Swiss-Prot record:
GO process annotations (BP): meiotic cell cycle
Entry protein name: Meiotically up-regulated gene 176 protein
Native source species: Schizosaccharomyces pombe (strain 972 / ATCC 24843)
Upper classification of the organism: Eukaryota, Fungi, Dikarya, Ascomycota, Taphrinomycotina
InterPro entries tied to this protein: BRCT_dom, BRCT_dom_sf
Basic residues composition-biased segments: 12-27
Function of the protein: Has a role in meiosis.
Record region (Disordered): 1-88
PROSITE patterns listed in its UniProt record: BRCT
Annotated keywords: Cytoplasm, Meiosis
Length: 406
C-alpha cells in the first residue's frame, strides 16, 4: 500500500488532438474580455511588488544609518574626535568640495602662484587653503591681447595719422592753413600750435609752405629729426585715408633758407615777371641784351646784318612765318626758286657765309633731284596728305617739324 507521505503522481491523460491543436483551440475558446482582464491584473501585481521592494530597501538603509549614529553616541571617546583641525582638513578631498565644470580649468604642473587672479601676499599663504585659483593668467592674457590688437587695428583704420604730431605753418598762397589743420585732426593727428622740441611730446612732422626764417632755423638746428612736408602730403593722406609715404612730398628747409636770403637781398630776382612787361621788353629795339649774348646762334635775317646790335621784332616774326619756314614737302619749282633766292643773297653778302653757318637741312637735301615721274607722283601724294593734316600756325607741333629744301 502506498504510504501517506508519498505524493500521488497524477496520471497523464492522452491528448485526443494533435500537437498544438488543443492549445489553439483553448485560446480560441476563451473570450477576449477575459484575456484582457487577466493581463491587466498581472501588470498591476508586478507594480505592487516593485513598490514593496523599494520601500523595504529604504527602511533597511534608514535602520543602518540609525545604528551608526547610536554607535557614535554610545562611544564618546572616539580617537578621530581628538584629532587636530589641520588633520581633518587633510582628510578631505578637493574633488568632494569643488565640482568640475566647463568654466574651471585644471591646474597644470608648471603652474606658479604668481599667475593667480586672487593671489595675495606670499607671506600670508595658508597651506590648507583649498580655494586656489583655477584659471591661470595665461588664458586671460591671450584674450586681452586679442582685444587690444583688434582695437588698435580699428583705430588705425579710422585714424591713420594717429601717431603723427604735426606743426603747420602756411603763408599766403593756394593752401589754407585752417583746412589743412582740420584735415589733420580728422585723420587723427595731433596739431601743435608751436614747435615743441621736448623729448616727451616732440613734433614729428612740419607742414610748411611760405614759412618764416625763424621756423626754418629752429627746424634745421633741432636735435630731434623733424620731417618737413608740403601740404600736398596732407591732401594725399586725406583723399586715400591712408598714411602715404613722405618721400614724394619732402621739403628741404636749407634750400628754402637760401631762397629766403636771396629774396631779402634782391627781391626782384624771385618775383615773377609780368607778361605785359615781358612783351614790351622784347619788342623794344633799344633793349637787346638777350640778343647780343646769343647773336652767334641766331638764323640769318632778311633785313638785317650781324654787325648791328639792334633787333627788330617785326622782321623776326616775318622771317619765322615766311615761305622758307613752311613745313612739309615742297614741289620742284618752289624749291628751285627758294634755292636761287638763297644763293643770290649769299653772293651779295659774302661775309655772312664766314660768320654764320648754314642750316643742316639745306646741306643734306641740296643734291637731291627728281628724275622720274613716279617720284613726282609720290611727292604730290605726300603733299596732299600733309595739307590735309597741316598743323595750325600757333600749334606747338609746328616748331618741332624739320625744314626740307630741295
Amino acid at each position: 500500500m502506498p504510504s501517506l507521505n508519498q505524493e500521488e503522481t497524477p496520471k497523464k491523460t492522452k491528448n485526443p488532438y494533435r500537437k498544438g491543436h488543443s492549445r489553439r483551440q483553448s485560446r480560441h475558446s476563451i473570450p477576449s474580455d477575459e484575456l484582457n482582464s487577466n493581463s491587466s491584473k498581472s501588470l498591476n501585481n508586478d507594480r505592487i511588488s516593485r513598490t514593496i521592494e523599494n520601500s523595504l530597501q529604504k527602511e533597511t538603509n534608514s535602520d543602518n544609518k540609525i545604528k551608526k549614529l547610536s554607535k557614535t553616541k554610545s562611544n564618546p571617546t572616539n580617537p578621530k574626535s581628538e584629532e587636530d583641525p589641520s588633520q581633518i582638513c587633510q582628510s578631505f578631498d578637493e574633488s568632494n568640495i569643488i565640482t568640475p565644470s566647463k568654466y574651471l580649468f585644471p591646474l597644470s604642473k608648471d603652474y606658479s602662484p604668481n599667475e593667480g587672479l586672487f593671489q595675495t601676499d606670499m607671506n600670508e599663504k595658508n597651506p590648507h587653503d583649498l580655494w586656489n585659483p583655477t584659471v591661470p593668467m595665461a588664458y586671460l592674457s591671450r584674450s586681452l591681447q586679442g582685444l587690444t590688437i583688434s582695437k588698435i587695428n580699428e583705430t588705425e583704420q579710422k585714424f591713420p595719422l594717429s601717431s603723427v604730431h604735426a606743426y603747420v605753418e602756411i603763408g599766403e598762397g593756394m593752401f589754407s592753413m585752417e583746412i589743412v589743420t582740420e584735415q589733420l585732426r580728422l585723420l587723427g593727428a595731433t596739431v601743435h600750435a608751436s614747435l615743441q622740441m621736448t623729448e616727451e611730446n616732440p613734433v614729428s612732422h612740419a607742414v610748411l609752405y611760405d614759412c618764416s626764417q625763424e621756423t626754418l632755423k629752429k627746424i634745421s638746428s633741432a636735435q630731434v629729426p623733424i620731417v618737413c612736408v608740403s601740404p600736398k602730403w596732407v591732401l594725399a593722406c586725406y583723399s586715400s585715408k591712408y598714411l602715404v609715404d613722405e618721400e614724394m612730398y619732402l621739403v628741404d628747409p636749407q634750400d628754402i633758407l637760401q631762397t629766403k636770403c636771396l629774396q631779402t637781398d634782391d627781391s626782384e630776382l624771385l618775383n615773377p615777371l609780368d607778361p605785359f612787361t615781358d612783351t614790351q621788353m622784347i619788342q623794344d629795339p633799344s633793349d637787346a641784351f638777350f640778343f647780343d649774348t646769343q647773336a652767334e646762334n641766331l638764323e640769318p635775317f632778311v633785313n638785317g646784318s650781324p654787325d648791328s646790335h639792334c633787333f627788330n621784332a617785326d622782321s623776326f616774326l616775318d622771317q619765322t612765318l615766311s615761305d622758307d619756314y613752311e613745313f612739309g614737302l615742297i614741289t620742284c619749282s618752289d624749291s628751285n626758286e627758294s634755292s636761287m633766292s638763297n644763293d643770290a643773297q649769299r653772293e651779295n653778302n659774302p661775309e655772312t657765309i664766314s660768320q654764320i653757318s648754314l642750316s643742316p637741312t639745306a646741306d643734306l637735301f641740296s643734291s637731291f633731284k627728281i628724275t622720274t615721274d613716279l617720284e613726282m607722283t609720290h611727292l604730290e601724294s605726300a603733299k596732299k596728305k600733309y595739307l590735309a593734316y597741316k598743323p595750325l600756325i600757333g600749334s606747338p607741333l609746328k616748331k618741332k617739324v624739320s625744314l626740307i629744301d630741295f
